[in-house]
A protein has these predicted regions:
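N-terminal cap/lid segment of alpha/beta-hydrolase-fold proteins
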Residues: 42-92
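Catalytic histidine neighborhood in serine/cysteine hydrolases
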Residues: 295-313
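Primarily recognizes the serine-hydrolase "nucleophile elbow" in alpha/beta-hydrolase
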Residues: 182, 188-253
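Surface beta-strand/loop "capping" patches
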Residues: 317, 324-362, 387-395, 401
Length: 429
C-alpha cells in the first residue's frame, strides 16, 4: 500500500468524530495545564530500554539495535514502544544525536537510521503508533511487516500497545485515550534514552519529523527545552489555519485547546528548519510560513520551500537540507543561506547571505485547496501551480520586479543543493 493510501486509511475517520458521552465536552481533568505537568515529569525521568536481539537489523543495517521501552499507561495497562537505536563506533562525549519521528502510515525505518548514522549521528527512531516488526529489517512499512500488537518475544503480561494514529479524533476523550498524548511522550523518552546513554553530547541532540512526525515534533518542542535543533518536514503548527483537510482535524475546539503547537512557541528557543513543499495536498504552505515567522526569532531558524516536492518518507530522505542544517548547528558545518532582510508587498528586493542563485515563485490568485475526489475528503490539493521566474543576485542583494499579475509570491535561494526561502508575501497592490 503506498504512502498516500496509508494516510487515507489512518485519517479518513477523523472527519467524522465519534459521538459518545465523553466526546461531547472536554473532560475537566484534560487541560493544557495537565499536559504541562505530565510532560514536565516525563522529561525528568530515567528511561530504561531492553534490546531485542531477534529483531536487530542485519546486512547493510548491521549495528542498528532493536529495542523496547515503556510508554505511557493505556487503559490501566503498561505499554511498550519499539525503536531502532544506533551509535557510531567512535561515539563519545562530542557525538551529535537525533530522534527520528516517522509519519502517518509509516514506522521506524532502519533506512532512515542508517542515513543519519552514516553522517556521524547517534540515532533513535521510535514507532510512535504502537506497531512492532514481524520480521528482521522491517522498514518498508508494508502491511505484512508490522503489527499493532505484542506478539512473540514482545508479548508480556500486563503490557499492551499505545493507540494508533487517530487523526485527532479522540481529542475530547480522556487523555490516556489520545494518540497524540502517547506519541509526544514516546519522543520525550526517546530523547532521554540518547541523552542518558553516556555516548553523545548532551547539547547536540535534535529531533526530525516527517509529515505527522513533523506535527508531533512541532507540539513536542513546546514541552521539552533540551533539543539543540529541530527539522519538521511537511507538517508544522497552525494547522487549524490550514487550507487542506488538516483544518478539519485541528479546528475542533478540543484539539485546538490541547494540541495547537503554536500556543507554546514562546517556550521554544532552538533553531528550526521548516522544510516543506509548495504543492503538498496534506499540509498547506501558509501553515509552514506562519510557523516559520513565529519561530524566526530563534537564531539559525530557516524556512525551506522545495518546489514540486512530493509527499513521502522517501522524498524527504532525498533532501540534503536536514543533515546540512543539523551539521551547521551541532557540527560546526557551514550555515545554510539566510535571508537578512525579507521581501515585502511593495518590493521583492532583499538581502541574503551564502546564496548563489535566486528565484521567484508566484501565483496569480489567492492560494486555495479543493478536493480532487468528491468521495474522498482527504483528497485535497492546491488549485494553483507556482510560476517560476529568475531573479538577479549580486553580492547578496536580490533585485527584480514583482509581476503585475502576482497575488502571492515567495523567493527561494540555493547553495550546494540546499534551498532556503522567504515566507509567502501577499501582494496588496
Amino acid at each position: 500500500m503506498n504512502f498516500f493510501l496509508k494516510m487515507v486509511a489512518f485519517f479518513f475517520a477523523a472527519l467524522f468524530p465519534i459521538i459518545n458521552s465523553r466526546s461531547a465536552v472536554l473532560p475537566k481533568e484534560t487541560t493544557p495545564e495537565m499536559l504541562d505537568r505530565v510532560y514536565a515529569e516525563c522529561v525528568k525521568e530515567t528511561v530504561a530500554y531492553t534490546e531485542v536481539a531477534e529483531f536487530a537489523p542485519d546486512g547493510e543495517y548491521d549495528g542498528i539495535k532493536a529495542v523496547v521501552f515503556d510508554g505511557f499507561d493505556y487503559c490501566g495497562e503498561k505499554t511498550k514502544i519499539f525503536a531502532y537505536l544506533a551509535f557510531p563506533e567512535d561515539a563519545g562525549e562530542d557525538t551529535p544525536a537525533v530522534v527520528l519521528v516517522h509519519g502517518g502510515g509509516g514506522h521506524a525505518y532502519p533506512e532512515w537510521v542508517k542515513q543519519w548514522l552514516d553522517a556521524g549521528y547517534a540515532v533513535i527512531a521510535p514507532d510512535v503508533t504502537g506497531y512492532f516488526p514481524k520480521e528482521t529489517n522491517s522498514g518498508a512499512a508494508t502491511d505484512d511487516e508490522w503489527t499493532h500488537s505484542l506478539d512473540g518475544v514482545f508479548a508480556q503480561d500486563g503490557y499492551t500497545v499505545i493507540p494508533d494514529n487517530d487523526g485527532m479524533r479522540h481529542s475530547a476523550d480522556a487523555l490516556y485515550e489520545q494518540w497524540m498524548y502517547h506519541a509526544v511522550g514516546a519522543v520525550i523518552r526517546s530523547f532521554s534514552i540518547l541523552l542518558q546513554s553516556g555516548k553523545v553530547a548532551p547539547d547536540k541532540i535534535g529531533v526530525v519529523g516527517i509529515s505527522w512526525g513533523a506535527v508531533i515534533t512541532s507540539i513536542y518542542l513546546g514541552y521539552d527545552s533540551r533539543p539543540a535543533f529541530a527539522v519538521p518536514i511537511y507538517g508544522s503548527a497552525y494547522l487549524a489555519d490550514s487550507l487542506s483537510y488538516m483544518k478539519n482535524m485541528f479546528a475542533q475546539k478540543s484539539t485546538r485547546s490541547l494540541w495547537s503547537a503554536e500556543d507554546r512557541f514562546d517556550r521554544v528557543t532552538c533553531p528550526i528548519l521548516w522544510l516543506c513543499s509548495d504543492c503538498d495536498g496534506n499540509f498547506s504552505l501558509n501553515s509552514n510560513c506562519m510557523s516559520y515567522l513565529a519561530t524566526a526569532k530563534n537564531s539559525g531558524t530557516r524556512l525551506s520551500v522545495v518546489t514540486a516536492m512530493q509527499h513521502s518518507h522517501e522524498a524527504a530522505w532525498e533532501r540534503p537540507e536536514p543533515i546540512v542544517f543539523a551539521d551547521s548547528i551541532v557540527n560546526g558545518g557551514e550555515p545554510m543561506p539566510e535571508f537578512l532582510t525579507l521581501p515585502t508587498c511593495e518590493s521583492l528586493s532583499c538581502t541574503v547571505s551564502g546564496a548563489s542563485r535566486a528565484r521567484l515563485y508566484y501565483i496569480t490568485e489567492d492560494m486555495t485547496y479543493s478536493l480532487t475526489d468528491e468521495s474522498n475528503p482527504l483528497s485535497t490539493m492546491p488549485d494553483q501551480s507556482w510560476i517560476k521566474a529568475p531573479l538577479d543576485i549580486d553580492g547578496g542583494n536580490i533585485t527584480g520586479e514583482i509581476p503585475s499579475d502576482a497575488v502571492m509570491y515567495y523567493i527561494s535561494v540555493t547553495s550546494d543543493g540546499c534551498t532556503v526561502s522567504s515566507p509567502i508575501v501577499k501582494n496588496e497592490k
